[in-house]
From Swiss-Prot:
Annotated source species: Salmonella typhimurium (strain LT2 / SGSC1412 / ATCC 700720)
SMART domains: REC
Residues binding ATP, per UniProt: 170-177
Subcellular location: Cytoplasm
Changes after translation: Phosphorylated by PgtB.
Domain Sigma-54 factor interaction: 142-341
Phosphoprotein keyword on record: yes
InterPro entries given in the database record: CheY-like_superfamily, Homeodomain-like_sf, HTH_Fis, P-loop_NTPase, Sig_transdc_resp-reg_receiver, Sigma_54_int, Sigma_54_int_dom_CS
Boundaries of every Response regulatory domain copy: 7-121
Name listed for the protein in its UniProt record: Phosphoglycerate transport system transcriptional regulatory protein PgtA
PROSITE patterns associated with the record: RESPONSE_REGULATORY, SIGMA54_INTERACT_3, SIGMA54_INTERACT_4
NCBIfam families assigned to the protein according to its UniProt record, in alphabetical order: ResRegPgtA (NF047793)
Function of the molecule: Member of the two-component regulatory system PgtB/PgtA that regulates the inducible phosphoglycerate transport system. When activated by PgtB it acts in conjunction with sigma-54 as a transcriptional activator.
Keywords: Activator, ATP-binding, Cytoplasm, DNA-binding, Nucleotide-binding, Phosphoprotein, Transcription, Transcription regulation, Two-component regulatory system
Length: 415
């Protein structure tokens, strides 16, 4: 395998030419490895190698297009610089259109060759640095150890190198919007706007406004089935342009096949997403992620609330692992925050003291539990009613009525 000290992989079937180029490039300070056949050379290229390929365009059994296809099977961003004779210029031009870095016509101008090599190496180092940053970011910030999570990170890293449209689908709280946000943050359009809209029949007519706001960035549309066929065709046309004005991300609860079967997505838009749809699994499908996620959100909540991180008893941890978590990560994060302030996060968890008491009517138990939940929410948000209502996902008026019922005052929780 080539290490990163070797910066140029040189291919030419003429040994004398190979030696001449090798000598010239080594005198210029580059580490070169020469090969007389591209198939042999390909075996020496490791993943994320920081070098480039410099090759003759016409060799027995291998054209410039063949060579580019061979090397781009594993990494379509590996720079390939072609050297061509006069009669092979059309082939070299075609190869550049299909992804080769550039080409030089024989006789080669050494000065121009060195400039192209340095530009290609600079670009290559930038690509590898971004990949490493993406990998480290996703490893640290996307919590989980399941096989699905490993594949999710890898898929996001791969797609972040493109600006192609992506479809995320699954239940609420499974990471659909998180995936969309990381695609933007780690992608080519990271400096552009991140525009997100939950489409409804009422706002679908504002699509052009959403598109204008997303220029140069990422447009995330939840429930694109609310768009008319004409609007869907328009989105598909924009994504088919050579230079896409923005990255399109679709978010839904169903797969594209299910959307198509229900006649909710136009064929043109379907094919924009067809190769890049990502199924986001529920927590019940990836139980290996539950414990690390709970511990992550517990530490996060304790840091924000300035509380010590409590120990998680073995039985409680077993209960957390057994729970289905129907609202997925969102529900798990809320449970971790409640545990940070002393509330056991499982609805089925019973206070041992209650087992020694006479049976309590169900309505009273429900009221006691509701009062406890509201009390803890007031503690967490220090009596700020808007935040408490949003946290509990109930209207402010309903929250005030419940507080009045249980004799709770927001003033007692402000500190």
């Amino acid at each position: 395998m080539l290490n990163d000290e070797c910066s140029i992989l040189l291919i030419d079937d003429d040994v004398d030419v190979l030696d001449a180029y090798t000598q010239m490039l080594e005198q210029a300070g580059y580490r070169v490895r020469g090969f007389t056949h591209p198939f042999e050379a390909k075996e020496w290229v490791k993943a994320d190698w920081e070098g480039i390929v410099l090759s003759d365009v016409c060799m027995p059994g291998c054209s410039g297009i063949d060579l580019m296809t061979l090397f781009h099977q594993d990494d379509d961003q590996l720079p390939i610089l072609l050297i061509t004779g006069h009669g092979d210029v059309p082939m070299a031009v075609d190869a550049v259109k299909k992804g080769a870095w550039d080409f030089l016509q024989k006789p080669v101008d050494p000065g121009k060759l060195l400039i192209l090599i340095e530009d290609a190496l600079r670009q290559r180092r930038s690509v590898i640095a971004r990949r490493q940053y993406c990998q480290q970011t996703l490893q640290v910030e996307l919590i989980g150890r399941s096989e699905w999570m490993n594949q999710f990170r890898q898929r996001l890293q791969q797609l972040a190198e493109t600006d192609i449209a992506v479809w995320f689908y699954g239940e609420h709280g499974t990471g659909r919007m998180t995936g969309a946000r990381y695609l933007h943050q780690l992608g080519r359009n990271a400096k552009g706007p991140f525009v997100r809209y939950e489409l409804t029949p009422e706002n679908a007519g504002q699509l052009e406004t959403f598109i204008d706001q997303a220029q140069g960035g990422t447009l995330v549309l939840s429930h694109p089935e609310y768009l008319t066929r004409e609007q869907q065709h328009h989105l598909a046309r924009l994504q088919s342009l050579e230079h896409r004005p923005f990255r399109l991300v679709g978010v839904g609860s169903a797969s594209l096949v299910e959307q198509a079967a229900a006649n909710q997505i136009a064929a043109e838009l379907y094919y924009c997403f067809a190769m890049t749809q990502i199924a986001c699994q529920s927590l019940s499908q990836r139980p290996d992620d539950i414990e690390p996620l709970f511990r992550h959100y517990l530490r996060k909540a304790c840091l924000r609330l300035n509380h010590p991180v409590p120990e998680i008893a073995g039985e409680l941890l077993k209960g957390i692992m057994r729970r289905a978590w129907p609202s997925n990560v969102r529900e798990l994060a809320n449970a971790a925050e409640l545990f940070a302030v002393g509330v056991l996060p499982l609805a089925e968890t019973v206070n041992p003291q209650l087992l020694l008491q006479e049976p309590t009517p169900l309505d009273r138990r429900v009221e006691e539990y509701e009062r406890q939940i509201i009390t803890e929410a007031l503690n967490i948000h220090q009596g700020r009613i808007n935040e408490v209502a949003e946290y509990l996902q109930i209207p402010r008026k309903k929250l005030y009525l419940r507080m009045k019922k249980y004799g709770l005052s927001k003033e007692h929780y402000k500190f």
